[in-house]
Amino acid sequence: AGEQVGGMRAMFKITIQYLNTRFQFGEPIGRFQALKHMAADLLVDVESASTVARIAAQTMASGSGDSELLTYLAAFTCADNFRKVTADAIQLHGGIAYTMEHPAHLYWRRAQTGQWLYASSDKLRDLYLLEMEAKL
C-alpha cells in the first residue's frame, strides 16, 4: 500500500507540473475549470489512500486486533486508487502520456501489474468482508 501511495503522489506531482507548464489558448491548461476539478479529484484519491495506508501501518505497529482488517482495507483501497489516479492523470496529460518518452505509462503499468503481483482488489475486498463478518 505504501508503494502504491508513493506512486500516486509521484504521478500527481508530474500531472500538476504538466498542467502548469502546458499552454493552450495563451494560458496554462491548469487554469481550465474542468481540469482543475479532475486534479482535485486526483488529490482526494491520493490523500484518502494515504490516510488508510497510514492508519493500517500504525495499527499493525501497535499490535491491535484490527490490523488484519485494516490491512485488507488499505490494500484494496490503495490498489483501486492507484489505478484510477494513473488512468485519470494520463487523460489529463493527453497524447504525451502515451509515449515512451514520458514516465506516465510506467506508473500506469505499475498500477496494473499490482493486480497480478499481489491479490486482486476483488479478492482483497472479499477477504475484508469475511474478516468484518467474523468480527460480528
Feature map (PLM): residue ranges:
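Alpha-helical interface subdomain recognition
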Residues: 1-136
